[in-house]
């Protein structure tokens, strides 16, 4: 799970934060846990920050630590709650690409809860649009863009998706 806030332990180093689920839920030896945590940090390009503490790294780096921690146990499913919350557009794109690459690389099913249309366009294969707790629409990006559904909520979502796709991922 990748939380909206990175949800890191301030008193633990970056390496220790990634090791935390391994310490709690794996039967690995201490050396194996370190090796796995370092591998995950390397995968998100943060191996050089392993001895730093969360307060010493940027918000984008904290999100990448959260991603490394989320994949440490090699899950089949990855749940992301607003993974780009509080990040600038450039860093958001990096996080989107990282989630997409890791999901593809490890063949994980990923569920992303987001309001970020760039994320929807960039990494969404299948989209479920929920409005006021009700499923309004489900399908691929192209199905949504070419949909003839006409409720106000469906039109609003469709127009936002079309506008964002024309604007591009700047």
List the predicted regions and their residue ranges.
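Catalytic Walker B motif of ABC-type/P-loop ATPase nucleotide-binding domains
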Residues: 78-81
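A short, proline-enriched helix->beta-strand linker immediately N-terminal to the Walker B motif
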Residues: 72-76
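H-loop/switch region of ABC-family ATPase nucleotide-binding domains
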Residues: 114-115
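Conserved ABC ATPase signature
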Residues: 53-57, 61
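Short helical segment in ABC ATPase nucleotide-binding domains corresponding to the A-loop/adjacent helical element
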Residues: 15-23, 34
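Helix N-cap at the start of a conserved alpha-helix in ABC-type nucleotide-binding domains
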Residues: 89-91
């Amino acid at each position: 799970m990748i939380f909206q806030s990175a949800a890191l332990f301030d008193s633990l180093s970056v390496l220790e934060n990634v090791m935390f689920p391994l310490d709690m839920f794996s039967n690995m030896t201490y050396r194996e846990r370190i090796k796995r945590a370092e591998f995950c940090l390397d995968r998100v390009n943060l191996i050089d920050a392993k001895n730093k503490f969360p307060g010493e790294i940027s918000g984008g780096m904290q999100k990448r630590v959260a991603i490394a921690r989320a994949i440490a146990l090699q899950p089949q499913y990855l749940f992301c709650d607003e993974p780009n919350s509080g990040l600038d557009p450039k860093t958001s794109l990096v996080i989107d690409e990282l989630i997409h690459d890791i999901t593809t690389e490890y063949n994980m099913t990923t569920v992303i809860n987001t309001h970020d249309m760039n994320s929807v366009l960039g990494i969404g294969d299948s989209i479920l649009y929920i409005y006021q707790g009700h499923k309004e629409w489900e399908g691929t990006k192209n199905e949504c863009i070419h949909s003839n559904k006409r409720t106000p909520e469906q039109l609003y979502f469709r127009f936002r998706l079309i506008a964002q796709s024309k604007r591009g991922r700047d």
